[in-house]
């Protein structure tokens, strides 16, 4: 099966729950992890006579997301009913937006591994309400003996971000989702946690002959619950479509469910079109009017976004593109870095970045910590850097101190005192050690006499061992050279 003569065309529909305090149509708490069916009311349950009242904060968050994603904002929009029947939707319809979404014509730029940049267009962002959550007694819907419904999620404000079919590979889809997640997290509209369902993604995919401008038959792929699952699902569907086409067949327009454990997709249902939902304007809500002044007020409240911050880290602090990208990848990492640089001074920015990327991230990976669980404060790191600058500890010992800070939560100065890690900078003490290691290693001494420069560094290493890494390395090299020259004159 050759993929060279085929082109994959991908569009994404990304659902993101907004982090408002309360739901979109009522005063119930918007809270993940509560006991089932505790954050509900007649509006959530669609009881007769219960009417929705718009939580305007959800509108603000939608506009904020749209501006962060370079969208135009619709000043006149409305809500519509999307009609379908499912157990988690007691009203029999979802309040959504059909022909007048709040945001439209946006884009996100992604940078691929080969350094090329691609612009992925965003067709629309509309505001809608989430449904409840089904809990199945079994591994999946088909095998479940019964299902339970938790309506805590019903009425949670949700935005749906729909891309144009601009993506061409699993790699591009993964990069887009990572970038989208970062932008939305920076803008403060959502915690975008896929593991908690606050960011969910459906994939629309088709395959066509390379060079063709016509779209192939589209498959919608659901139940892709992580970025890596999205990429695996796309790769599987791409191969499935190509296999059908090369065998002379034609893929069906259908909705399929991704089963990540088996690495396969299975048929859910034949694909519906928009007319199947019988959209019509929501009669219980007035049209939504947003003034130009309101849009500008929300724009002015946007924080510095990832692309702008990355550029600033490179221009103001001299960080490489890689280092800057790793730091801005998570909002918490960027805030941590900026606070540390503020404490240490701009001249220490590269040093802070090195410690953050090489040591802090290492420890966090080893311990399985997320960006909300940074185990060392900027104050602790800067305190340790000052001890290095003052000559109190060596760079090598600093790594030990850093690990101790992670383990104990103590500051560097306390750890150095308690562990006896102060740098040995006494010339007399170090010269005595240097003379001893030179005298007791005649073979290495002869190598040095023969012009092998690495022999001197070997002796420095022996001094570092004797002092448990506490010797000043520059002083150690100077005194090793002195001891070698003394030995050569004997």
Swiss-Prot record:
Biological process (GO), any one: translation
Ligase as UniProt keyword: yes
Entries under SUPFAM superfamilies matching the protein: GatB/YqeY motif, Glutamine synthetase/guanido kinase
Record GO terms (molecular function): asparaginyl-tRNA synthase (glutamine-hydrolyzing) activity; ATP binding; glutaminyl-tRNA synthase (glutamine-hydrolyzing) activity
Catalytic activity line of the entry: L-glutamyl-tRNA(Gln) + L-glutamine + ATP + H2O = L-glutaminyl-tRNA(Gln) + L-glutamate + ADP + phosphate + H(+); L-aspartyl-tRNA(Asn) + L-glutamine + ATP + H2O = L-asparaginyl-tRNA(Asn) + L-glutamate + ADP + phosphate + 2 H(+)
UniProt key word Electron transport: no
InterPro entries: Asn/Gln-tRNA_amidoTrfase_suB/E, Asn/Gln-tRNA_Trfase_suB/E_cat, Asn/Gln_amidotransferase, Asn/Gln_tRNA_amidoTrase-B-like, GatB, GatB_C_1, GatB_Yqey_C_2, Gln-tRNA_amidoTrfase_suB_CS
Signal peptide location: none
Pfam families, per the entry: GatB_N, GatB_Yqey
First-tier enzyme category under EC: ligase
Enzyme Commission (EC) number: 6.3.5.-
Keywords: ATP-binding, Ligase, Nucleotide-binding, Protein biosynthesis
Family in the record: Belongs to the GatB/GatE family. GatB subfamily.
Quaternary data: Heterotrimer of A, B and C subunits.
Xref: NCBIfam families: gatB, PRK05477.1-2, PRK05477.1-4
Role this protein plays: Allows the formation of correctly charged Asn-tRNA(Asn) or Gln-tRNA(Gln) through the transamidation of misacylated Asp-tRNA(Asn) or Glu-tRNA(Gln) in organisms which lack either or both of asparaginyl-tRNA or glutaminyl-tRNA synthetases. The reaction takes place in the presence of glutamine and ATP through an activated phospho-Asp-tRNA(Asn) or phospho-Glu-tRNA(Gln).
Name of the protein: Aspartyl/glutamyl-tRNA(Asn/Gln) amidotransferase subunit B
Organism: Symbiobacterium thermophilum (strain DSM 24528 / JCM 14929 / IAM 14863 / T)
Lineage of origin: Bacteria, Bacillati, Bacillota, Clostridia, Eubacteriales
Gene that this sequence comes from: gatB
């Amino acid at each position: 099966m050759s993929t060279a003569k085929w082109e994959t065309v991908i569009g994404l529909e990304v659902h993101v729950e907004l982090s408002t305090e309360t739901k979109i149509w009522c005063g119930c708490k918007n809270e993940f992890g509560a006991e089932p069916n505790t954050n509900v009311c007649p509006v959530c349950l669609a009881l007769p006579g219960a009417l929705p009242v718009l939580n305007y904060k959800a509108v603000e968050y939608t506009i904020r997301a749209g501006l962060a994603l370079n969208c135009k904002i619709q000043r006149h929009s409305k809500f519509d009913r999307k009609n379908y029947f499912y157990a988690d939707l007691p009203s029999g319809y979802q309040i959504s937006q059909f022909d007048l979404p709040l945001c439209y014509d946006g884009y996100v730029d992604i940078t691929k591994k080969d350094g090329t940049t691609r612009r992925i267009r965003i067709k629309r962002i509309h505001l809608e309400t989430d449904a409840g959550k089904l809990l199945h007694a079994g591994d999946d819907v088909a095998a479940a003996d019964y299902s339970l419904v938790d309506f805590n999620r019903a009425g949670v404000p949700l935005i749906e971000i729909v891309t144009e079919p601009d993506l061409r590979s699993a790699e591009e889809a993964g990069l887009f989702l990572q970038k989208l997640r970062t932008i939305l997290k920076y803008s403060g509209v959502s915690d975008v946690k896929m593991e908690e369902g606050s960011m969910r993604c459906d994939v629309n995919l088709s395959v066509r002959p390379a060079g063709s401008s016509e779209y192939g038959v589209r498959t919608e792929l659901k139940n892709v619950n992580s970025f890596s699952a999205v990429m695996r699902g796309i790769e599987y569907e791409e191969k499935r479509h190509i296999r059908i086409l090369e065998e002379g067949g034609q893929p069906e327009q259908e909705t399929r469910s991704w089963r990540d454990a088996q690495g396969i997709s299975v048929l859910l249902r034949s694909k519906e079109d928009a007319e199947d939902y019988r959209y019509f304007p929501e009669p219980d809500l007035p049209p939504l009017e947003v003034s130009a002044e309101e849009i500008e007020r929300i724009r002015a409240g946007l924080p510095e976004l990832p692309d702008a911050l990355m550029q600033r880290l490179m221009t103001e602090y001299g960080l490489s593109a890689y280092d800057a990208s790793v730091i801005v990848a998570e909002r918490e990492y960027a805030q941590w870095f900026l606070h540390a640089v503020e404490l240490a001074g701009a001249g220490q920015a590269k040093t802070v970045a090195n410690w953050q990327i090489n040591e802090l991230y290492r420890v966090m990976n080893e311990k399985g910590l997320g960006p909300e669980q940074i185990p060392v404060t900027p104050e602790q790191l800067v305190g340790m850097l000052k001890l290095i600058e003052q000559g109190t500890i060596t760079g090598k010992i600093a790594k030990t101190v850093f690990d101790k800070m992670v383990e104990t939560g103590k500051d560097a100065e306390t750890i150095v005192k308690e562990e006896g890690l102060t740098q040995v900078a006494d010339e007399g003490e170090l010269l005595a050690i240097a003379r001893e290691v030179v005298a007791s290693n005649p073979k290495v001494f002869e190598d040095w006499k023969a012009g092998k420069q690495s022999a001197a560094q070997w002796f420095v290493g022996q001094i570092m061992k004797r002092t448990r890494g506490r010797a000043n390395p520059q002083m150690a090299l100077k005194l090793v050279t002195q001891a070698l020259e003394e030995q050569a004159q004997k």
